Amino acid sequence: MLRTSPVTHNGSINLIKADNDLVIAGYASVEMVDKQGDLITRGALKNAFGDFMKADGYRNVQLAHSNIQVGSVIPSYTDSDGRVWKSGVDDAGMFVVIKLRDDIEKAREVAKEIRKGALRGFSIGGQAFKRMRKSDASHGDYTEISKLELHEVTICEKGINPEATFRILK
């Protein structure tokens, strides 16, 4: 597992607050057929996430795919109870730890909306390079994405992947 503290396996994100910082953590994508009929494989997520994390200045977190950077994916975070949360891809999916900015008004607005419960989901943005139409009894008809480039993680009301949601850890 990527973290030392328990996390629900229903895709929920836990909010961790330290000082004036706002840090959230949870699954931004899990391997399942999403609302658009796409299934991103864990292998694709693992490769794309590895490349994404190599350039620390470009680990973009946006609001609703708006091109406004409101935070950054960070490698890990230790909460006030001493639990370590780590970004990476595990058996459930792509788990991210995100530190929100507090130096711009839009990021402060996002933090406020998270605390109010208005923003509850994650989505990811990128470019798919390898897609294949598939069909099986458990998933029906879907498009499997086995290679992609990850450009950003976005915070939104509801993501396309229903398991990419969060709750506040109090």
Q: Could you tell me what each predicted segment is?
A:
Residues 1-170:
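Signature of dsDNA virion morphogenesis modules
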